[in-house]
Swiss-Prot record:
SUPFAM superfamilies: EF-hand. Pfam families: EF-hand_13 (PF17958), EF-hand_7 (PF13499), P2R3B_EF-hand (PF21161). Keywords: Calcium, Metal-binding, Nucleus. It comes from the Eukaryota. Its main location: nucleus. It comes from Homo sapiens. This is Serine/threonine-protein phosphatase 2A regulatory subunit B'' subunit beta.
Length: 575
């Protein structure tokens, strides 16, 4: 048996064993004999039509009939759909004459007919599954439609352009930045405006079929025939945010950055919302996330950088600059050698190989060309700098799970730790023996099953970042070793609205990038002038990074190259 394999029972043999156990029971034998007797002589055991039953019909058993003792595995075939389980003690087993047996059988049938049938269970269970939200009786559709018609009456020819959709969104009771989805959902991109009749018909249908914000948002953006959102569906919505949000007004002078920002936000949306890794965001996933709450905050928060979960420009700038530093040939792709230079070669080569193996990337380009795109890099950088979130834990678990069996064996842990030991030796640092390291990690994670660590074990562990860094990030591993265990536990147990590891990293890196950009600009009077936040961003956009177009300028509909970040990869099955 190969090392690292865990013995598991053969399912068919176990089922056969349970079936033979059930078949050998005395009650089962009596029941089968009675069934065989019924088959051989059907006329003797069946009631006549005059007895109130159909010819050939078996007497109906009460639902509360006791089951025979003994182990019966789930799915074991029963004697028949209406055969009483207590038939083994039936008078038919005694050597009575034919007339007596028919009389006894008739009495049993009549007695059972007199017993009232229990009410259907399904009638007492209320509806609990609402894929498009729970219907609300308080919604007055006609009143909403009347308000919308009054709003359209203020526009020329009762047609609304994109600039008018803010008022329409408010009339619909939606947040301001739903105006883009509302406009495109009503077909406004084809003619440049939306008529009142077409919009009312569209919104009335949504109110009748979609009963919460998640279902409405998905319905507005999804492609025809779908009930989910893919990455391209978010482009028109985000293009409107870039065009109209006051916190992104400085981007009007650098339109080539629109598609870069949109690509980053789309990847962050799928990173946080698409928990199934399917590449498709459903109503249920959107409902469980905080994305729609952040969309509503776009109207209230003028500083886009305060919305750190999805829309922060500072976070985009950090991610993009880190990618540009690695992409030395500026072909919009980075290979394994480029990625190895991240953070001064902190990652092990074995882990880099796993990233490029397709374990955490979509699309076939990685396997064919050995390169990853900017969209893949967004996932990598966020996962690398914050290993405490559910998505990042899944990201690195997939990389470490070499055989894809859903558990990390001791062999897989040793496979990654060997390179860590070699790198420590090259730095003249004594490495901890693997057995000692393994004991520490098992005490840290406390797996429920001995001999393997599952994804759920790591999600329960508050120090998953320490676990992962121990096996493939030499710099962070040494940093953890220098900290006291009490300090690590304090960091893991800290509650409240404290910044996440990613937010801390992005804030620090952005300050460094702005300082470097400011220090590189000469001033005639010899003194450094204090730049406003807007001037800092404009200065950054004028940097050498902006001299070479990273994307083509977006079309009027905001089309953007998503680096073929397709969702059809068979390797990314939901965990």
């Amino acid at each position: 048996m190969p090392p690292g394999k865990v013995l598991q029972p053969v399912l068919k043999m176990k089922v056969d064993e349970l079936f033979l156990y059930w078949l050998s029971e005395a009650s089962t034998q009596r029941m089968l004999q009675d069934c065989l007797r019924r088959i051989k002589a059907p006329g003797r055991d069946q009631p006549t039509p005059g007895d109130g039953e159909q010819p050939g019909a078996w007497p109906t058993a009460p639902l509360a009939a006791p089951r025979p003792s003994g182990l019966e595995p789930p799915g074991t075939p029963g004697p028949g759909p209406a055969l009483p389980l207590g038939a083994a003690s039936s008078p038919r087993n005694a050597p009575h004459v034919r007339g007596t047996r028919r009389s006894a059988g008739t009495r049993v049938v009549q007695t059972r007919k007199e017993e009232p049938l229990p009410p259907a269970t399904s009638q007492s269970i209320p509806t609990f599954y609402f894929p498009r939200g729970r219907p609300q009786d308080s919604v007055n559709v006609d009143a909403v439609i009347s308000k919308i018609e009054s709003t359209f009456a203020r526009f020329p020819h009762e047609r609304a352009t994109m600039d008018d959709m803010g008022l329409v969104a408010k009339a619909c009771g939606c947040p301001l930045y739903w105006k883009g989805p509302l406009f495109y959902g009503a077909g406004g991109e084809r003619t440049g405006s939306v008529s009142v009749h077409k919009f009312v018909a569209m919104w009335r249908k949504i109110l009748q079929n979609c009963h919460d914000d998640a279902a409405k948002f998905v319905h507005l953006l999804m492609s025809p025939g779908c009930n989910y959102l893919v990455q391209e569906d978010f482009v028109p919505f985000l293009q409107d945010v870039v065009n109209t949000h006051p916190g992104l007004s400085f981007l009007k002078e650098a339109s080539e950055f629109h598609s870069r920002y949109i690509t980053t936000v789309i990847q962050r949306i799928f990173y946080a919302v698409n928990r199934s890794w399917s590449g498709r965001i459903t109503c249920a996933e959107l409902r469980r996330s905080s994305f729609l709450q952040n969309v509503a905050l776009l109207e209230e928060e003028a500083d886009i950088n305060q919305l750190t979960e999805f829309f922060s420009y500072e976070h985009f700038y950090v991610i993009y600059c880190k990618f540009w530093e690695l992409d030395t040939d500026h072909d919009l792709l980075i290979d394994a050698d480029d990625l190895a230079r991240h953070n001064d070669h902190a990652l092990s080569t074995k882990m880099i190989d796993r990233i490029f193996s397709g374990a955490v990337t979509r699309g076939r380009k990685v396997q064919k060309e050995g390169k990853i795109s900017y969209a893949d890099f967004v996932w990598f950088l966020i996962s690398e700098e914050d290993k405490k979130t559910p998505t990042s834990i899944e990201y690195w678990f997939r990389c470490m799970d070499l055989d894809g069996d859903g558990a990390l064996s001791m062999f897989e842990l040793e496979y990654f730790y060997e390179e860590q030991c070699r790198r420590l030796d090259s730095m003249a640092i004594e490495a901890l023996p693997f057995q000692d390291c393994l004991c520490q990690m098992l005490d840290l994670v406390k797996p429920r099953t001995e001999g393997k660590i599952t994804l759920q074990d790591l999600k329960r562990c508050k120090l998953a970042n320490v676990f992962f860094d121990t096996f493939f990030n030499i710099e962070k591993y040494l940093d953890h070793e220098q900290k006291e265990q009490i300090s690590l536990l304090r960091d893991g147990d800290s509650g409240g609205p404290e910044l996440s590891d990613w937010e801390k990293y992005a804030a620090e890196e952005y300050d460094i990038l702005v300082a470097e950009e400011t220090a590189g600009e000469p001033w005639e009077d010899g003194f450094e002038a204090e730049l406003s936040p807007v001037e800092q961003k404009l200065s950054a956009l004028r940097s050498p990074l902006a001299q070479r177009p990273f994307f083509e300028a977006p079309s009027p509909l905001g089309a953007v190259d998503l680096y073929e970040y397709a969702c059809g990869d068979e390797d990314l099955e939901p965990l």
